[in-house]
């Protein structure tokens, strides 16, 4: 896949709406207002060239130019000038990154063909694959690092990560506070009653006679949606950061973020055919009624038409493969693979639609039902103590806490919840040594990270096609969700895991331009997970038995591993060019959507794995340092194809090329370009020779789709 993106932007800013439009009440009741626009020339390079020191890659203060890894940084000014509203828009200025398309919720990015992670001030956050939209407005800078994290940060995914640096009153380059209070107030309105109010203020202050800085940011949104039945978005965000100089030796940095989000995921269209894509022609029709007790919902038990304990609308057609040639048989042959004398393999009559017709589908009509919901409450806190000793040693104690409470319900047949929290305690001891020919920076870092999780999924009898999108969700398609009765879950995991790690990093730079960066880390992880059997559906898509004999009830295990990295680079004098080579092996924990570990992965040791990276590249600054470029060629691979989480951490091998240019032509004009070529291979699918997939209408060209849209055929 190739991606070529060119950014060519004259930058200007628009004044806010009139003061009356900034009243609090407008957040909830948007009114019509005339927008007054002024054009204002912005001077400088828009803070879009990577000149600042960034410690989110290796833990040392190096600029992106000097860092021997493929990485990009996006400043607050750059996000403002390019009008970036959510995390997905960061891909415009970062090669190797892609939107996840996770049911319309911008929780994270795919980096180098696999799901990426998010970090907050250099500490890994809980997984967020569509749990809630990750906010970017409260960030001073976002660093996008491609490939696994450095050993100093602990186990990490293979693809890469985004590190969010919250707005602060302390100037990162100098360590001083901003000279005076500064703030901003803005209100945004638009189509579909878009209503967003943001406010921020920060500056210097004193507490107990000690100098300090503060920065507060708040955001409120109450917006409708283009899509029918969608609840829109209601969210509130509060972020605070504080810096206190206790004395000349010790400083405190503490703060946090609270984010409350309510919306809905969007599964898009169903009953997909080529005619729908080409001409907008949608197959209408009603699924067979299954709600036998008349409560308006179809329970798992009501999907068991013949009463044998197994669903009858989700057969696994092992003799048909959407990965191979199109199935060319007839409907009768499809339903009777053993021949007419053997009887039907499954009952196709209950899957056929009734009152079939066609219609032109309004693009605003999707699978969202009126009572669908996605609710997430996340709290993030940090408290750092930094001591700069007279001997030159710097000791940093970082304490981090994050929790989220998530509920996700979709009428077509999917629900989940998770209640998870993580606490990380990290000590970093470092010093810079300077000699006649070189300087050396070292970091030693023991750490402890504890994660506690409770997570449940409900995806058995998940039927996308039963709903006729020309009308609302009804008792013909709406399923009784496990989260509403707290029973009949497909998977349910309760447990915890604790990672004890120790890392050492060294950054060696000779004054002739040669630089070596190396590090090693050891992790020992205690993990346990269990399933409450009384809350599970039997049989289900995860447990293929009706008596519970197939359930992995509980497991505990101890795993350990070593991570390392080695980079060498050379700053070629008077050229502005820095070629580099990086080799690394990084541990990873195979956690799911709610940070959970499955019982089977814990029992088998498959909850822990390593990844390998080989990367070659060259970076440079030319034209009086107004043009920055970066070129990298890489190959990275998860080492154990059997250890994976399908949604969040798959066993993948990727290789490719990434290229980035940012050119500040003059004080008004910025030109940027990114290029990505990536090939991703799922190692588990290659090893198994197949991969489970839902079979669509295009895979069975000789069978009328309306004969199957009342259920869902699976295959491999």
Predicted segment positions?
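Solvent-exposed loop segments that connect transmembrane elements
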Residues: 266-365, 462-488, 528-557, 591-604, ...
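N-terminal Sec signal peptide and the immediately downstream disordered periplasmic leader
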Residues: 1-84, 88-96
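Short acidic/polar hinge/loop motifs at secondary-structure boundaries
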Residues: 99, 108, 124-148
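Face-selective signature of the C-terminal outer-membrane beta-barrel domain
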Residues: 377-404, 417-536, 569, 573
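Outer-membrane beta-barrel translocator/receptor signature
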Residues: 138-140, 151-239, 246-251, 379, ...
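Gram-negative outer-membrane beta-barrel transporters
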Residues: 512, 626, 630-637, 650-716
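Outer-membrane beta-barrel domain signature, strongest for Gram-negative TonB-dependent receptors
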Residues: 236-443, 450-451, 628
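Structural signature of Gram-negative outer-membrane beta-barrels, strongest in the C-terminal barrel
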Residues: 438-458, 493-637, 654, 664-666, ...
């Amino acid at each position: 896949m190739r991606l070529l993106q060119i950014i060519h932007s004259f930058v200007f800013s628009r004044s806010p709406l009139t003061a009356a439009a900034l009243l609090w009440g407008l957040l909830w009741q948007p009114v019509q207002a005339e927008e007054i626009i002024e054009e204002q020339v912005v001077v400088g390079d828009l803070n879009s060239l990577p000149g600042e020191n960034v410690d989110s890659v290796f833990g040392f203060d190096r600029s992106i130019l000097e860092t021997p890894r493929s990485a990009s940084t996006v400043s607050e000014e750059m996000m403002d000038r390019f009008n970036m509203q959510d995390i997905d828009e960061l891909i415009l200025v970062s090669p190797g990154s892609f939107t996840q398309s996770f049911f319309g919720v911008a929780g994270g990015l795919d980096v180098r063909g696999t799901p990426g992670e998010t970090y907050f001030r250099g500490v890994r956050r809980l997984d967020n694959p569509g749990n809630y939209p990750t906010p970017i407005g409260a960030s001073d800078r976002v660093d996008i690092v491609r490939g696994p994290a450095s050993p100093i940060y602990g186990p990490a995914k293979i693809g890469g990560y985004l590190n969010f640096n919250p707005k602060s009153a302390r100037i990162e380059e100098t360590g001083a506070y901003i000279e005076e209070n500064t703030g901003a107030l803005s209100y945004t309105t638009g189509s579909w009653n878009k209503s967003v109010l943001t406010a921020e203020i920060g500056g210097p202050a004193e507490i107990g006679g000690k100098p300090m800085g503060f920065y507060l940011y708040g955001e409120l949104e109450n917006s409708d949606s283009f899509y029918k039945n969608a609840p829109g978005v209601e969210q509130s965000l509060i972020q605070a950061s504080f810096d206190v100089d206790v004395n000349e030796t010790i400083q405190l940095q503490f703060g946090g973020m609270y984010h409350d989000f309510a919306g809905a995921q969007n599964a898009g269209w169903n009953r997909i055919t080529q005619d729908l894509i080409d001409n907008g022609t949608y197959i209408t029709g009603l699924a067979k009624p299954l709600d036998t007790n008349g409560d308006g919902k179809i329970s798992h038990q009501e999907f068991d038409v013949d009463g044998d304990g197994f669903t009858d609308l989700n057969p696994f057609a092992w003799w048909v493969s959407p990965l191979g040639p199109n199935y060319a048989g007839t409907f009768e042959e499809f339903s009777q693979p053993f021949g007419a004398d053997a009887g039907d393999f499954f009952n196709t009559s209950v899957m056929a639609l009734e009152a079939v017709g066609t219609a032109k589908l309004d693009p605003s009509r999707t699978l969202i039902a009126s009572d669908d919901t996605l609710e997430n409450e996340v709290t993030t806190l940090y408290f750092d103590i930094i001591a700069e000793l007279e001997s030159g040693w710097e000791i940093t104690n970082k304490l981090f806490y994050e929790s989220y409470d998530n509920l996700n319900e979709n009428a077509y047949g999917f629900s989940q919840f998770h209640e998870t929290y993580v606490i990380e305690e990290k000590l970093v001891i470092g010093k810079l040594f300077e000699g006649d020919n070189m300087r050396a920076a070292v970091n030693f870092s023991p750490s402890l990270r504890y994660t506690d999780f409770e997570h449940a999924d409900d995806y058995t009898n998940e039927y996308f096609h039963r709903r006729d999108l020309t009308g609302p969700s009804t008792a013909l398609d709406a399923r009784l969700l496990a989260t509403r009765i707290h029973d009949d879950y497909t998977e349910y995991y309760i447990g915890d895991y604790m990672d004890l790690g120790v890392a050492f990093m060294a950054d060696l730079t000779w004054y002739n331009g040669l630089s070596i960066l190396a590090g090693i880390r050891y992790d020992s992880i205690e993990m346990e997970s269990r399933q409450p059997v009384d809350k599970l559906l039997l049989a289900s898509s995860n447990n293929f038995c009706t008596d519970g004999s197939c359930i992995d009830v509980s497991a505990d295990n101890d795993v350990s591993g070593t991570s390392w990295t080695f980079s060498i680079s050379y700053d070629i004098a008077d050229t502005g060019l820095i070629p580099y080579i990086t080799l690394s092996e990084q541990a990873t924990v195979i956690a799911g959507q709610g940070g959970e570990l499955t019982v089977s992965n814990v029992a088998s040791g498959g909850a822990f794995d390593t990844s390998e990276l080989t990367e070659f590249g060259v970076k440079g600054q030319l034209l009086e340092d107004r043009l920055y470029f970066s070129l990298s060629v890489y190959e990275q691979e998860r080492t154990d194809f059997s250890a994976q989480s399908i949604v969040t951490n798959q066993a993948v091998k990727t290789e490719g090329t990434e290229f980035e240019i940012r050119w500040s032509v003059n004080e008004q004009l910025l030109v940027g370009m990114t290029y990505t070529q990536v090939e991703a291979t799922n190692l588990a699918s290659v090893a198994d020779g197949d991969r489970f997939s839902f079979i669509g209408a295009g895979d069975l060209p000789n069978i009328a789709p309306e004969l199957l849209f009342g259920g869902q055929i699976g295959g491999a």
